[in-house]
């Protein structure tokens, strides 16, 4: 999902932002002949994510940096684990330290939070999915992290899937008119999702042939009734008031996917350290 050229372009921008016109500390203290060795260690349990991005930081800074990882993306790591060994020119290691950690800590944090939500759902068929509430220009990395943590992905951007919300319904005149107009104007390859907050809207969405029906902020009993109405005629998405405590109860209503911005927006960074 993350191509090498996409990673490299993004990392170059991050390094440019952080190094600026030069690392005045490192460049005035370290000689070109100075080499360092270090370890990437974890100070807490979690799911590792972002290895290739971490490597890309140092690949850009120097061809002489060597990194050996002992885990792969998606692996569970425990407090005290040595994740990787790294060695190379001191200038490259010191200038890349913060940027490399920013990526791998953030991505591992999201993967870890996603994994917690999927575990909370239990053996139910539902999958936790992300939303478009992401960090600007970091969405691809955050979505990759969700996938790595065991979640599924919602639309990447506005061109992936048509999603009809309340404002669109008001604009079109009715839910039915909105779906019918989209069916006429968009590609057959695009699915249409409708956001519903009442059972009447659910019935209308089923009758007009919506591909995906989102149950927005519905009480559990209403959600169960909505799933009975839909009865396999559309993919059922639950959204709103999703927490680690409520995820299983929502899943047991019979929905197919549970969307939550929390797995990205509220995910804490994973405490990883580069010890040299």
Q: Model-found features: residue ranges?
A:
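Glycine-rich beta-strand-to-loop/alpha-helix junction loops that act as flexible
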Residues: 215-216, 236-242, 260-262
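Acidic/glycine-rich phosphate/pyrophosphate-binding loops and surrounding catalytic core
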Residues: 2-197, 201-208, 212, 224-229, ...
């Amino acid at each position: 999902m993350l191509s090498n050229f996409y990673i490299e372009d993004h990392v170059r921008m991050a390094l440019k932002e952080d190094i600026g016109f030069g690392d005045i500390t490192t460049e005035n203290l370290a000689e070109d002949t100075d080499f360092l060795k270090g370890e990437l260690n974890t100070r807490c349990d979690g799911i590792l994510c972002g290895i290739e991005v971490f490597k890309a930081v140092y690949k850009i800074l120097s061809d002489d940096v060597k990194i050996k990882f002992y885990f792969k993306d998606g692996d569970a790591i425990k407090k005290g684990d040595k994740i990787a060994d790294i060695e190379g020119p001191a200038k490259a290691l010191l200038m890349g330290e913060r940027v490399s950690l920013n990526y791998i800590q953030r991505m591992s944090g999201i993967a870890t939070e996603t994994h917690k939500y999927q575990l909370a759902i239990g053996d139910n068929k539902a999958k936790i999915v992300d939303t478009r509430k992401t960090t600007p220009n970091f969405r691809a990395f955050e979505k990759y992290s969700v996938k790595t943590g065991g979640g599924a992905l919602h639309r990447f951007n506005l061109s992936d899937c048509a999603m009809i919300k309340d404002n669109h319904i008001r604009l079109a005149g009715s839910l039915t008119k909105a779906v019918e107009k989209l069916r006429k104007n968009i590609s057959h390859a695009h699915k249409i999702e409708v956001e519903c907050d009442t059972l009447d809207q659910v019935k209308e969405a089923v009758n007009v042939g919506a591909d995906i029906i989102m149950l927005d902020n519905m009480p559990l009993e209403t959600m169960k009734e909505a799933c009975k109405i839909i009865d396999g005629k559309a993919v059922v998405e639950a959204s709103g008031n999703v927490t680690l405590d409520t995820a299983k109860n929502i899943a047991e209503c019979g929905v197919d996917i549970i969307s939550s911005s929390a797995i990205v927006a509220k995910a804490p960074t994973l405490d990883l350290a580069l010890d040299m």
